[in-house]
Regions:
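Class II aminoacyl-tRNA synthetase catalytic cores and aaRS-like
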Residues: 1-170
Length: 170
């Protein structure tokens, strides 16, 4: 029981109870996350993870490229919320096709992507629609490196977040 408790007081007590519980019941040698636990606003959770209960073990984060694509000449992304997911791995054409099939199965109209080649150039279905003078800006905004693939989700804000969240966990 707590009198005149603030939100911070409740969080602190809750974290103490949870930490003690986890330490008591965790398998021997298992690491327990120390308090304070991360606090993520709903808005930030939807932007970075695409859901309001993110699995923080998944290292992928969603990137907001809406403003960038409003200035770009790629018309299908104009007046839409654009989210992107960057992954670093050598992916086969089959992987792209599997992800595209998943995207259409959840209701997306398609899934654009770009791969960063060894020479720093891009390869992918929307490469020719992004002006050369904007490619370096996109590389900087998304933190792209050689070997990365970036997937694009463009839709209304709520649906873009939901789709990006589902792709992030696929």
């Amino acid at each position: 029981e707590m009198s005149f408790a603030t939100q911070e007081d409740v969080f602190r007590v809750g974290e103490e109870v949870l930490t003690a519980t986890f330490e008591k019941f965790a398998p021997e040698g298992a690491a327990v996350t120390a308090a304070p636990y991360p606090v993520i606003s709903y808005k930030d959770a939807m932007l970075q993870f695409g859901c309001d209960k993110p699995d923080l073990r998944n290292p992928l984060r969603i990137i907001d490229l809406t403003e960038f694509f409003q200035r770009c000449t790629f018309k299908p992304f104009h007046k839409k919320t654009v989210r992107a997911i960057k992954v670093h791995a050598d992916m086969s054409k089959g992987f792209h096709e599997k992800l595209l099939k998943f995207a259409t199965s959840i209701g997306m109209g398609g899934l654009g992507y770009l791969e960063v080649e060894e020479d720093g150039s891009y390869k992918g279905p929307i490469d020719k629609f992004i002006p050369e003078d904007m490619k370096e800006e996109m590389r900087s905004l998304a933190g792209l490196e050689v070997g990365d693939t970036i997937f694009f989700i463009a839709d209304k804000e709520k649906r873009a977040a939901e789709y990006a969240g589902q792709l992030r966990t696929e």
